[in-house]
Every structure is written in structure tokens, then in C-alpha cells.
């Protein structure tokens, strides 16, 4: 059970989450084996040279800091996470919560119109399912209220779905929905999937991708006893025999860059106590059993690794033998309350493993330049990315950054006893282009959103000099601030101007170390609250995030991460800087 506060407005949660107290910009640490000091320095130098080459290569694509035009034919997907809380004000109780995810397509091109239409139909079907879920929960909630009125302790009911984009390229889009739910007895899990042909938007059936299903399930029989050798369950091929009569309508499956994965919930192949089974058959194990169109042919890829029971078999160390790669959640139990909560995640690659402390996270397997990496986007006190080289997983050194996948926007509203939290999340499906929020030296003020790519050394790189500020954090100037006036591209229009004391400013662009581009805003555009003897400001007029006019550029002096203007510390210049601790 995750320790989360569901009753805080999401805007405030986002601001606090992004807060950093006295944090310096981290150094990206090289992941190396047990080498001598000289060898380590040599590897570090090679990495820096590779990074520079990677950035130069991408700078040609992204000149003048303009948004990259999608020429790859790959769709990029946004996830619209929505959380509903149904409360009873009289008893101050949350009766139930429902979390669900809509699909949105970032691209507007005509070639993506069929896929966009399929997403719209998917979202409509989701609304119908939600209506039935609410109806069921309303019935359970009446029992909850009755228990509360009689003095019994109530348990919050919930249904929470996380969506994973297993593949999104010019041939296929594959989505896995993982739902955790409790209708009053105990926590349970279920999975659903849907797969699309990118060109036509057509929903793919299992036999559209796996043309020799008999051979596929024979391989699955062998794999299930490799990955789940300690349990005695029905063979996947026996289950498939009955499922084929309905054209595998009830089979949960996805297609990824690695291969095709089938998912069996607890109780399907065995007893409830046997847990679920997730089996992946790779394309390169027997390419002939798959439809050629959907066999992934590129050398680089990224796929999500769902923590708990998904195992992928790849050769991580180049010895010609496939290694089992998987991720597990780590838990502890409070001895008094018996509540179970996350304490971290553990990554396995063959005989190697490593633990990472966090209370939640997402894992992605990345293949780049013949090597395998695990990207661990985790959240503890702050959000971090650990980039783990699976060849050297036992190494003490780990490459980490104050980095996370981007959040487009977050909103909260309340109607009667129902609260709604909405956030639009970026996804990581393309090694050539993904959006992430990074804390540079200006991280004490806000995160910076940039377009990134995976470099040849496996770490995220960006050719953008500056990025967007989408957190909606605003400040009030405590003194006159000298600045320059610039246009959208950063060309100076007026070199000597100032923002007067008492002005409300909203940062919209910034680079990692030196400057932020701001606009002035009115109090009507903001939510203003008091705390610790000062006021804090967050944006409510979200249209301002899309402003494209001229800006005031405020330039800082940067002394190893300590920011000032003409020797005056930023805390004496701006009101509303949120810090932790």
C-alpha cells in the first residue's frame, strides 16, 4: 500500500514535489566495472566525447531551439490521468476513489488521423466502463456509510488503473492497463490490453501478429516453467486451446520491440496463491512465427518493465546467453497497524541485482548501441532518474539526475462531495525523442522541461539550450529587477529595462544555469496562499503557459549553484520560492 495523500489540491502537491532545498546540480556518474583509476577517467572522457557528438548530431535537427518536426512516423502518446474521490462530508470520509487513464495523441498529421480516431473510440468505451464502475461503488458506499454510522471502522474502496505504452512506432501501438482494486475484502489486480495498427487505426487481434499460434504457445509452455519453476499450473497452450475458439478474445497480450507478451491473472492458469504469470516470447527466438510487419527491426528501443512479475530475456553482458531481467517492488509492514508500504525497488539482470530506495517508481529497459540500460524514474523526497548499465549492475556507482518524465499540466476541482484531480503525463516510447523535466542549477526555482534523446552511452541528452517551465510557479519581486526584453527565439529587443518591485512574474522558459524568461501576470491569474510568513503563487489561468510573445529575460550570477543578481541572493529578490526543509 502506497503512502499517498489524496486530499491535497494537485497544484499544491506538484509545487511541493518540485521543491528542492539547498540542492546543487548533480554530476552524472559513470557506471563502470572494477577498474583502475586511470581506466575510469578514460571511460569518463570517452563518455564526454560521445555526449558532445550526440548533441551535435541532434543540434542539426533542432536548430534555433525550434520544436522538432516528427519525420519518423512514430506516434507519441500522452496519458491523461484522472482521479475521482467520492467523499462523505458528514463523516469526513472518502468512500471510494477511481483512477483511470485517457489516451491522447500529440501528433496532428493526417497520417495519424485513423489512430487518433481509434483513441477517441477507446476513450468513449472507457466512459461507459466508468459509469458501471461508479454505479457498483455507489452500492458498496451505502454499506460503508451504514458501517460508519454503527461505529465500525470503514475501509476506503478503490479502483486504480495505470497504463503502460508497450510500443508506439509506425507499425503498432500496444497498451497494457494494470488495475489494482478493492471492493471491500482485499486488494486484487487485473490486466487488460488493446493493440492498434498505426497506419489504419484498426484494433489488432492476436492472430494478426502471431501467425503460428501453436508454435508460440509451445514456446510459452517452456518459458513459463523457466520463469515460474516453483509452481504447478496449467500449461499456457492448454488455456490457449480453449481461447482460440473465441479468436483469443479474452487473451491479454501486447506486442513490444522485444516480442509478444501474454498475461495471465491470478487464478487463470493456477490457484489464486500462485499469483499471475507474464510470459514474453522474443522475435529473435523464432521470427518466422510472427507477422513480418510487426517484427521490430530497429537496433535501439525502449519498453516499460512492469514491476512484480514481468521478465524479459536479453543478453545484457555479451556472453551469448540470455539473462533474466526484471524489477520487483520492495515492501515493509508496520508492526502496529499492519499497513504495508513501498520502501523501494530492486532491479535484477542475470546474477546481478541492485536496490533503490523510493516509495514509487517506473522502470524502462533501454537498448542503445548494443548495450542494455534500466531507466528508473523514482520518487522519494524528490524525483530522480537512475540510469543503470545492466552490464555493470553491481558497481557502486550509479548515474543519476534530478530528472523525471514531463507533466503537461495538473488541475484540481471539486463539485459537491466529489473531487477530481487531472494530470497529463508524457510517455517514454522513443529513444530519439521524449520529454523530461530536469533540475539544473535553477532547480531551486522550478524544473525545466526539454526534449531529450538517449545518447550512445545510454544516458539522456538534450540539444536544447533552453526549455519550458510548465510547473505554474509564480513569484513576486521584492526589489526592482534589471533585465532585457527578448523575443521568442531569445533575440534582444531592448537591452536595458527593469521589472519594478511588487510585480508578479511567471517564468515560462529558462536554461539550466543562467537565465529565465518571464511574463508579468495579474493576481486574477493566480492562486495565492500564505505560509511561513510569506505568500506563494501558483497559476490558475493555464492558457498563459502557451504564451508566445516577448519576454523579460532575468539573468543570474551563478556561484556553484548559488544564484544572485548583482550580489543579492534570490531569496531577497523574489517572494514565493518554495523549498523543503
PLM ranges: what are they?
Residues 1-10:
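Bacterial N-terminal signal peptides that target proteins for export
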Residues 178-183, 264-270, 327-334, 341-344, ...:
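Short, flexible beta-strand-to-coil junctions
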Residues 351-357:
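A short beta-strand motif characteristic of beta-propeller blades
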